[in-house]
Curated annotation (Swiss-Prot):
Region (Disordered): 181-266
Gene field: Acrbp
Name this protein carries in UniProt: Acrosin-binding protein
Region of interest (Pro-ACR binding), residue spans: 25-104, 316-424
PANTHER family: ACROSIN-BINDING PROTEIN
Keywords annotated in UniProt: Cytoplasmic vesicle, Phosphoprotein, Signal
UniProt keyword annotation of Signal present: yes
Polar residues bias locations: 256-266
Pfam families, sorted: PBP_sp32
Amino acid sequence: MKLAASFLLMLLEVLLLPETPLSAEEALASTPGSPLSSTEYERFFALLTPTWKAETTCRLRATHGCRNPTLVQLDQYENHGLVPDGAVCSDLPYASWFESFCQFAQYRCSNHVYYAKRVRCSQPVSILSPNTLKEVESSAEVPLTSVTTPIVSRATATEHQAFQPWPERLNNNVEELLQSSLSLGGKEQQSSRKLGLEQQHKQEQIQEHKLEEAQEQEEQEEEEEEEEAKQEEGQGTEEGLDSVSRLQSDSEPKFQSKSLSSNPSFFTPRVREVESAPLMMENIQELIRSAQEMDEMNELYDDSWRSQSTGSLQQLPHTETLMVLCYSIMENTCTMTPTAKAWSYMEEEILGFGDSVCDNLGRRHTAACPLCAFCSLKLEQCHSEASVLRQQCDASHKIPFISPLLSAQSISTGNQAKIPEKGRFAGLEMYGGLSSEFWCNRLALKGCEDDRVANWLKAEFLSFQDGDLPTKICDTNYVQYPNYCSFKSQQCLLKNQNRKMSRMKCMLNEKYHVLSPAKGEEVILRWSQEFNTLTLGQFG
């Protein structure tokens, strides 16, 4: 690990050498928080070539996370000095955006795409970044007389409701709801035109300010103190009126630009300007209602429709809306889309189906990740020509199922599980956008009590509940473990030795070698020791 750290320090020394002066166009593109240009990325990646150099940085990121001071400097360089705290976009066709730059960096490492680039997003990312909508809304409410004061986002009661952590309200604009595949295009050019207007507006304001200062100085030299006081008072009033009239006549994007410029934290790609202040909605029901009104259907989406619904997609009140929803989850990674989150919320909370997902074919969709079961059902419904209906889960739904369509989707971030064999579960291939190898390594380094490790263990444990004793933990070697951490440590240890072992359902009619809590601790320690031995062997 010392080798990795020393290599990164040398890398930073090279990166931070004085550069040749930038042209005006390059200087404009190098706004803090913006991605590197193609030329800048060539220079950046040249220092991470051959791949062992990139792998070295990835090992450090895997063990220390994105907050490691050395990695923070590296990430700052890749973002012109400021790591964005919202959603970012990439040049990967199958993983076009990520919820954070850290997630993007970890994805590059875990999937060995070391030279993937961060790019400017082709459309506003307000729907991708959980906090952006609140910040833009609060910026629009700043009084005109306090334009230059830092913007403070206001916490509202809705921020603590069950719709967290994604935005509580969705834009009724269909393009906002979908991802980049539904973009109508042209917004990048519009953003460029707006940026030019904003720069011109700022220059005009600076020139006006200089002229006003020169006039004040001349008046102070020519007139007596009493007359100066009167003129300064009159001039102050006139300037105040002029500034108010200028603000009122300016377009909204200019006002937002000036407001955001006073707060450095807003210089991130996630603050892409929306064409106008969006009309927000409480949930996906409002989208359906809006679509009905546009078609002059005038029938309210009310309890009578809900009580008649059996979960069939064909019974949704608006066909075009249904097509939009299906297109969104099929063209993108379903488990990551805001569409799936809103749709799931509507069915679970409003229609009352609850968390479990079953259909009329007797299948119980496997919850390998928070939205996996729901997306498995919806992909089947959207793609299948047969009538697939959602039903309340009961004893008749005995067939564990996960749609092959879900497994086939490219999981850019989030969790991914193999289709489980009957009565067996190998574990999550991906969790939080990171591979199982990463989590095994972190388990060995940080232990079971680490918050991130604990969440991973909990997610895996809850992903497989089968057998006569679903809360017990048994493996395919007929060993029963006192806790999931000891089981996972043993699985990581065997996997490192190229041996396979899976979790298996615990049955009453089977005999198992039951480990005591003390033996379980020994298993955990054994994996930690083996990993540390391997690490010391690699890095000296």
